């Protein structure tokens, strides 16, 4: 028996890779001889950079930027090749970085995303893809 697991992350809780690990463990418990394959997926929000890096065997570039509340925030973007990079706004300016009560567009910033872009340009990347899912620009009033 063969299984293919391709799940997006669960917002703010489990990554696509972790979900695949858990599903593989569960499948192996029920079907010890099964073959499990997984593919990281994402919808343009958190986890997008990791999914793309996994697919193309890219590498993470870590940095610290100004977070959504103007405090230092550790994040990363991805190197696809010498000219191309990928990043997600959620890493520097995303909803997962804020509690429900902190989600106030009058008090938050996306400045850190600009810092990620500047860092990528300083590293020589000229083709930069930016995933905007789960970013602060998606805050809406009920």
Model-identified regions with their sequence ranges:
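Glycine-/small-residue-rich active-site loops that bind phosphorylated ligands and cofactors
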Residues: 11-12, 44, 137
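Residue-level detector of conserved catalytic or cofactor/ligand-binding positions
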Residues: 138-142
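Anion-binding (especially nucleotide phosphate/pyrophosphate-binding) glycine-rich loop
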Residues: 72-133
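N-terminal beta1-alpha1 ligand-phosphate binding loop
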Residues: 5-23
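Extreme N-terminal starter segment of soluble prokaryotic enzymes
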Residues: 1-3
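Glycine-rich beta-strand-to-loop/alpha-helix junction loops that act as flexible
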Residues: 7, 132-135
